[in-house]
Amino acid sequence: MYRYKITIEYLGTDLAGWQRQAGIMSVQQILEEAIYKFSGEQVVLFGSGRTDAGVHAIGQVAHFDLSKNLETHKIITAINYFARPYSVIVWNCEMAPNNFHARFSAVSRHYIYRILNRPYSSVINRDRVWWISSPLDVLAMQKAATYLLGKHDFTSFRASSCQSKSPIKTLTELNIIKEDEEIKLYLSAPSFLHHMVRNIVGSLVLVGKNVWQAEYIKELLEVKDRKAAGPTAPASGLYFVRTEY
């Protein structure tokens, strides 16, 4: 068998997320069906991260196995041809060793969360940002973010449906940058809990609205209570940027 590693970009707005689900198209299903149409082989696609419905990706990585040794540029062309009705595209393909695993070989994952912070929304960026009309205090958000860096128990930022065995994660990057009318949050970690990024963003926004002091974020880590934290930020603003191996 030959193992192929692909890098994928997609708009998650009308999709069920990465993982196969009944009744609505997922990225995994779209790509598995596209691969079958050109190869004649049923494959299982393993992704580096399982994004939720509405979440986008710039550099999602996945792998699959085929019995055929095919030219990688032909694989890209074939997948994109059969996936063309959907907002999913493969922009890189390479051979990978048989011990490579898109999920378990990863050492770091990187996300960006986009907030449009102005009085009026955007037609072009609808479903691609979180629009917040009231001004946010970016300096307060930046201060609050420093409490989350490093190794912590992130129970307060974990979805109730999270299946991870441990709430302990190590956040290696959390930068907040204001660019004109947009606020971007850059988050990196070896791995994340379910909804962890969106729950962190939801809490930091309450700091930005001056509902909470920056120091309250530190307390959230200590109380280990999801109900004490902020709301889950909308999926529309979240982008899976890349995975490092």
UniProtKB/Swiss-Prot annotation:
Assembly, per entry: Homodimer.
Protein name: tRNA pseudouridine synthase A
Family: Belongs to the tRNA pseudouridine synthase TruA family.
UniProt-listed NCBIfam families: hisT_truA
Matching Gene3D superfamilies: Pseudouridine synthase I, catalytic domain, C-terminal subdomain, Pseudouridine synthase I, catalytic domain, N-terminal subdomain
Domain of life per record: Bacteria
HAMAP family in the record: TruA
Cited CDD domains: PseudoU_synth_EcTruA
Listed GO MF terms: RNA binding; tRNA pseudouridine(38-40) synthase activity
Residues annotated as binding substrate: Y111
Pfam family, one: PseudoU_synth_1
Positions annotated as active site in the UniProt record: D52 (nucleophile)
EC top class, as a word: isomerase
Reactions this protein catalyses: uridine(38/39/40) in tRNA = pseudouridine(38/39/40) in tRNA
GO terms of biological process kind: tRNA pseudouridine synthesis
Swiss-Prot/TrEMBL keywords: Isomerase, tRNA processing
Function: Formation of pseudouridine at positions 38, 39 and 40 in the anticodon stem and loop of transfer RNAs.
Enzyme Commission code(s) on record: 5.4.99.12
Protein species of origin: Rickettsia canadensis (strain McKiel)
Recorded name of the encoding gene: truA
